[in-house]
Structures are given as C-alpha cells and as structure tokens.
Amino acid sequence: MLFRSSLATQSEFNIGYDPCSNYITIPIIDEIGSLVGIKGRYLGNPDESHLKYFYLEKCNKSRVLYGYWQNKEHIKNNPYLIVVESEKSVLKLAEYGYRNAVATGGKTISKYQVELITRTGCTPIFAFDKDVSKEELDDIASMFIDSMKVCAVIDNDNLLDEKESPMDREDVWNALYQNCMITLK
C-alpha cells in the first residue's frame, strides 16, 4: 500500500484522491508555499494504459524539494537534512518523528535542488533506495561546495531488499540511520 500514514499526516500534506483517474493526489508545494503541481500515484496495480506515477498538473520537479514547506520549521532547528527520493518517504519519516526530511522526486538531483539544500545550512544526509550505488551518491556529493559536509545512509548490512526504500519499515530505518551513515565528503 502506498500510504500507511496517519490521517493527520495525510491531512497536513494535503494528500487526496481523484476518483476519476484512480490516482492518489500529492500536491507539490515549493519553498515559498505555492502550489506548483500535483503528482498522482495510481491506486492499485497499473495496467498498460496507466502510469504508476503521473503528474496530473505538471511542474518542474527539479525546482522543488518536496516536504520543505511542511517541514521548514523543523529543518531550521536541526543540523541535518534527510534527503530522500520519494514523497512517500517524506510522509513515512514524518510518521516516524523525523520532520527534517525532503524529497528530490527521484534519484537524480538538480543544481537548483543543491542550492536549496545548501541554503538550509544543514548537513544533507542522502537516504536513497537500495538500488542507488555509492558511486552515484559520490557524484551527487560532488555537486556541493567543497567545504560542505555531505553524508549518506548506505545499507552495507543488507537490511533492505533490492528495490526497497530505507523508510519502508520503521525498525530498518532506525537501524540504518543509527548504524549505517557514512560521510561522502
């Protein structure tokens, strides 16, 4: 199931449902609080005529860090910023009590997103899915200014399945966050 988060979290992030398309709706809010797009996640197993993820209202995802607006006060008061791939992971982390998280919308990151992360003043901790290699994370780290520390959570203990997100199970996330963090630069 996509969202096993509480109604309060879904309400705070304005998660909805479009019965016409059978998509869960995820409003994409930029860093100043403006609605810039709506992402949909097909409810159930999509057939050939439906995409699993689809922008119902298109936006430039490379100019947004999902969750920043909702978590901004927590981010300001934390030395670390957890950077994940998906919107779902931001919601899961909120459920686990981690309100210092944002999503890039995929395993790539834009220069603009790097600038947004840098402006927070936090040390970024990349917690991408298991299928993202350390080399890919090193490439991302190299996009940041030389003096900025960049960390990552890497599953060297093989706690995750191949396509699993570190946030899919709370006990696994806590173990990874506490025991599997490395400094990339």
Regions found by a protein language model. Name each.
Residues F13-Y17:
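Short amphipathic beta-strand and strand-loop transition segments with alternating hydrophobic
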Residues A8-Q10:
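Phosphate-interacting basic helix/loop segments used at nucleotide- and nucleic-acid interfaces
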Residues V36, V90-L91, E95-K185:
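TOPRIM fold recognition
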Residues D18-T120:
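Phosphate-handling DNA/RNA-contact segment within nucleic-acid enzymes
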